[in-house]
Amino acid sequence: MATVVNMDTVVNLDDVSLADKCCWICKEACDIVPNYCKCRGDNKIVHKECLEEWINTDVVKNKSCAICESPYNLKRRYKKITKWRCYKRDCHDSLLVNMSLCLIVGGMGGYLLISTEIVKLIASEEVSNIAKVFLVSASMGPFMVSALTMVRACIDCRTYFIATRERNTIHEVAEMEDVEEVEEVNDDDGDEYVDAVEEIVVESPA
């Protein structure tokens, strides 16, 4: 059974003692009243750590206040690279294929170049020019393929690095810069705030 929140329970901060103020996320005491959004009353009280953890669970959805809809003042920060968490799903299969292909083809080209003594055959005057062109093409082919696969592997590594860096991004919340604008809320904004709070539905125990 759901009941609509009674507006009489939404009080001003001036009417609440420091001992009664509690974070709306963890419900524990909070003696500091931050200025992260345009909310008023007890909906404004929240720990910085709790709010940041709540925002980082889904930045796209939680980047603004759910009640007053004012965007949070967020600042991006990356974790230390030694503390990064890597995810296998971000790694494309083509990266592993290209790395393996590069090593195999490059190794075959090196073995072919050394074992058959192609350099001596190319320098020999007994070999015709057509044969020399064929030998040069045959010796350079594996290295060209290896170079192309290496370029592709580098591109995949860059893509994987960017995806991993985004997953290890932390959004820190700071207090709003336009403090005076927040404090001077007109009557229309007050009505919208009341309507927003009235729409909150709290599940009551059966």
UniProtKB/Swiss-Prot annotation:
It is a multi-pass membrane protein. A zinc finger (RING-CH-type) spans 15-75. The chain crosses the membrane at residues 94-114, 130-150. InterPro entries: Znf_RING-CH, Znf_RING/FYVE/PHD. It is found in: Host membrane; Host Golgi apparatus, Host trans-Golgi network membrane; Host early endosome membrane. PROSITE patterns: ZF_RING_CH (PS51292). Keywords: Host endosome, Host Golgi apparatus, Host membrane, Host-virus interaction, Inhibition of host adaptive immune response by virus, Inhibition of host MHC class I molecule presentation by virus, Membrane, Metal-binding, Modulation of host ubiquitin pathway by viral E3 ligase, Modulation of host ubiquitin pathway by virus, Transferase, Transmembrane, Transmembrane helix, Ubl conjugation pathway, Viral immunoevasion, Zinc, Zinc-finger. Residues 1-93, 151-206 are cytoplasmic. Its main location: host cell. This is E3 ubiquitin-protein ligase LAP. The keyword Transmembrane helix applies. E3 ubiquitin-protein ligase which promotes ubiquitination and subsequent degradation of host MHC-I and CD4 molecules, presumably to prevent lysis of infected cells by cytotoxic T-lymphocytes and NK cell. Binds target molecules through transmembrane interaction. The result of this ubiquitination is the enhancement of the endocytosis of the target chain and the delivery to the lysosome, where it is proteolytically destroyed. Pfam families: RINGv. Gene3D superfamilies: Zinc/RING finger domain, C3HC4 (zinc finger). The RING-CH-type zinc finger domain is required for E3 ligase activity. Zn(2+) 1 binds at residues 23, 26, 47, 50. GO terms for biological process: protein ubiquitination; symbiont-mediated perturbation of host ubiquitin-like protein modification; symbiont-mediated suppression of host antigen processing and presentation of peptide antigen via MHC class I. The lineage of its organism: Viruses, Varidnaviria, Bamfordvirae, Nucleocytoviricota, Pokkesviricetes. One of its GO terms (cellular component) is host cell Golgi apparatus. It comes from Myxoma virus (strain Lausanne) (MYXV).
